[in-house]
Amino acid sequence: MSSPRDAEITIVGGGAIGAAVAYFLAREGRRDIQLLERRGLCEATSSQAAGFVGQARPTVDRARLTMAATEIYRTFERDTGYTMDYKECGAVRLALSETSVAELQQIAETAAVTGLPVEFLTHAQLRDIYPVLERTGTVKAALWSPTDGYLQPNSLVNAYVSAARDLGVTVVTNAPVTAVEIAGGAVRSVSTEAGRYRTDQVIIAAGPWSAALARLAGLELPIVPVLHEYFVTEPVPGWHGDLPCLRIPEVQVYARGESNRVLCGGFENRGTSIDPREVSVSSALRARPDWDVLGGFAGSLAEFAPALAGAGVAATFQGWPAFSPDGRFIVGPVSAVRGLVLAAGCNAHGVSGSAGLAMHLVESLSGDPSPYVRSLSPDRFVPRTWSFEDARREAQAVYETYYPMPSVTP
C-alpha cells in the first residue's frame, strides 16, 4: 500500500475527476505526481452517478469536447489494457413541444458542424428502437444519437487509476488532507493525518468537498453541492442493457436499461442544496431517499412506458454533484495562489465529462490555453464579489433547469 510523500504535483480527490486528471497529466509527460483520496477510490459522489455519456450539445465547443472524451472511453482498453465498460447503446431525446423541437433542431445543426451522427426518427422508427415506449402520442420529435452510451463509474475510475499507476503516479487511499500550506503567495505543502508533505502544486478535484479544500488554502469559491437522486427497479419485462439511453427533458426524466431492470432519474424543479460554508473536509454528505421526488420520476416515465408502473424498487442512489453559479466548469490555476489549481464545479458531468475536464485542465497549465478554457478559470470568482446566498441560489437553479437544457453549458 502506498503512503503520502513529497511530490511535485498533489491531486486531492479519488473520484472520476481526480483519477482522470492524474492519468492525463501523466500521459502528457508530467512526473512526480501523487493522488490523495480520503477514503477509497470512487466511494463518494462518482459512485452514485448514472453514467450517461451524451455527445449531442447545443454549442460547437462543448460538442467537440464530448466527442473527444467519448472517443477516449471507446478506445481506452485498446490504448491502456484497462476497460471502462463503455456501452455504446445510442441515445434518444424526446421533444413534447414546439419549443423542445427547436432545441433538438439546434442540437442537430451543431452535430452537423462537428460531424456527430444524429437523425430525427419517425414514430415507427422510435417504436423499433425503443419498443418499451408504448405511449408516444405526445412525442413531437425524437432525436437519435447512435454513438452515445453509458459508463460504469467504478470501471471508469479504476481504469484511469490503473493506467495512471502504470505511468508512475502514486495513488494513496485513506489519506484525508487536513491542511494546505501557503507561504509567499504559493503552495508549499499538504498535510494528512500521517504528516506534512512538500509539494509545488495542489490540484483540488474533490467534488462537493472542493470548496472546503480551497478554504484550507485561504480561498472562498462558490462550489455548491446539490442533491441528485435516481433509482433502479426490480426486473421489468422488455427492458435490457442494450436499450438506448433515454431523455425526456420536459418531464425532467432520464432512463436506461440496467440488465433487465430500469434505471430512472431526473432533475426536479425544486432542488436541495447545501451552503458550501457548511461543508468541511470531513463532512459525510449523505441523504435519505426522497420518495416524492423518485415517485415523480417513475410516474413521468410510466406515462410513456406503462410496464414500469408498479415495478418494485431494488436500489436508490443519492449523490451530491457540485454545481457552479454560472453552470460552467471551474478549471485551471488560481492566479492569486501560485500552484493552486481547481478541477471542480462539474455540474453533474463528473463521470461523463471526466476526460473532457481533465483535457481542459492540462490545457490550462500549458501556458497557452484557448479563450474557452480561459473562460473556465477559477479567477472569475476571485476576488470574491459574490455572496454565498446568491451563489447557492444560482447554482441550484442550474440544477433545476438542467432539463430543459439551460442556455449555458459547462
Residue ranges with predicted function:
Residues 3-17, 34:
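Beta1/beta-strand and adjacent pyrophosphate-binding region of the FAD-binding site
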Residues 26-46:
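Glycine-rich FAD pyrophosphate-binding loop
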Residues 50-129, 252-255:
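Dinucleotide-binding Rossmann-like beta1-alpha1 core, especially the glycine-rich loop
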Residues 64-67, 94-103, 143-162, 286-293, ...:
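Short beta-strand to alpha-helix junction loop
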Residues 144-200:
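Helical element adjacent to the flavin cofactor pocket in flavoenzyme catalytic cores
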Residues 196-244:
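Central helical "cap/lid" subdomain
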Residues 235-340:
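Active-site lid/adjacent beta-loop-alpha segment flanking the redox-cofactor pocket in flavoenzymes
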Residues 295-394:
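C-terminal catalytic lobe of FAD-dependent flavoproteins
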